[in-house]
């Protein structure tokens, strides 16, 4: 009998493994990306204090004003730009990238590249 692969469980296992080494500090907070089927979310987190410094998602008003979809690469680029802009307003210029167990490809890579182009260093 063929068993179906539980992709979410595999992703969560990878995410736990990566989180052992990726930790956000006050100097370099963590840029965490979460991808769902229709939306994408990004947060800049200081893990020492347990505080979220900046957020952006495809559900934000600024994103919806641009009339983009969150489930594609163009939308992910816009989310990357938004989170970088909001992080810089809070005085954050360097971050550690947390891909959340996802493969660095497609929407995850688009968020990272757009954040780099907007001025975040990682």
From Swiss-Prot:
<dbReference type="GO" id="GO:0006412">
    <property type="term" value="P:translation"/>
</dbReference>
<comment type="subunit">
    <text>Part of the 50S ribosomal subunit; part of the 5S rRNA/L5/L18/L25 subcomplex. Contacts the 5S and 23S rRNAs.</text>
</comment>
<dbReference type="InterPro" id="IPR005484">
    <property type="entry name" value="Ribosomal_uL18_bac/euk"/>
</dbReference>
<dbReference type="GO" id="GO:0022625">
    <property type="term" value="C:cytosolic large ribosomal subunit"/>
</dbReference>
<dbReference type="InterPro" id="IPR004389">
    <property type="entry name" value="Ribosomal_uL18_bac-type"/>
</dbReference>
<protein>
    <recommendedName>
        <fullName>Large ribosomal subunit protein uL18</fullName>
    </recommendedName>
</protein>
<dbReference type="GO" id="GO:0008097">
    <property type="term" value="F:5S rRNA binding"/>
</dbReference>
<keyword id="KW-0699">rRNA-binding</keyword>
<keyword id="KW-0687">Ribonucleoprotein</keyword>
<dbReference type="GO" id="GO:0003735">
    <property type="term" value="F:structural constituent of ribosome"/>
</dbReference>
<comment type="function">
    <text>This is one of the proteins that bind and probably mediate the attachment of the 5S RNA into the large ribosomal subunit, where it forms part of the central protuberance.</text>
</comment>
<comment type="similarity">
    <text>Belongs to the universal ribosomal protein uL18 family.</text>
</comment>
<keyword id="KW-0689">Ribosomal protein</keyword>
<keyword id="KW-0694">RNA-binding</keyword>
<dbReference type="Pfam" id="PF00861">
    <property type="entry name" value="Ribosomal_L18p"/>
</dbReference>
């Amino acid at each position: 009998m063929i068993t179906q692969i539980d992709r979410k469980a595999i992703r969560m296992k990878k995410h736990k493994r990566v989180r052992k080494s990726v930790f956000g500090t006050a100097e370099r907070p963590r840029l965490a990306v979460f991808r769902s089927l229709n939306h994408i979310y990004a947060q800049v987190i200081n893990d020492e204090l347990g505080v979220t410094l900046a957020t952006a998602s495809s559900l934000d008003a600024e994103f919806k004003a641009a009339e983009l979809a969150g489930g594609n690469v163009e939308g992910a680029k816009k989310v990357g730009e938004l989170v970088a802009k909001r992080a810089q307003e809070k005085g954050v210029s360097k971050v550690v990238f947390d891909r959340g167990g996802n493969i660095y490809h497609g929407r995850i890579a688009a968020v990272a590249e757009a954040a780099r182009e907007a001025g975040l260093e990682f």
